[in-house]
Amino acid sequence: VEFWDLGPELTRPARALKLWLTLQVLGSQAVGRVIDHGCVMAELAEQRLRSNPAWQIVCPAQLGILNFRYVADGTLPDSQLDQLNQSIAKEITDSGFAQVFTTELLGKRVLRLCIIHPETTEQDVLQTIHRLEQAQAIAPANR
């Protein structure tokens, strides 16, 4: 049992407590700035990925989250692209540099960036994109 997830009486979920405490400590303006920063960083990642035709934006950046997919030159079957994207996520996550996970959207395996840390910089985002590009070059399914 995670007592943090329960209210003072330890029987019901206290879902609002985390948000309430965050707003009390940081204030609504600071929370707004953090959310805006995440949105800007995700939009930067989207802009950078759109400049390379090997990447497909599956769902535009929203609230700091970007869903995209490596499509290479467009000739690989979806099953191979699904494996390739899974390998890319594993490669970059295993490196410890960034946490890039996969999900399924529109029946396809896609990569997901969730850029919500308030200290994430433009350089961090660009370096993550660079490492994604390196990972796709060495991913097993690409050989």
Spans of model-derived segments:
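Conserved PLP cofactor-binding pocket of PLP-dependent enzymes
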Residues: 65, 94-112
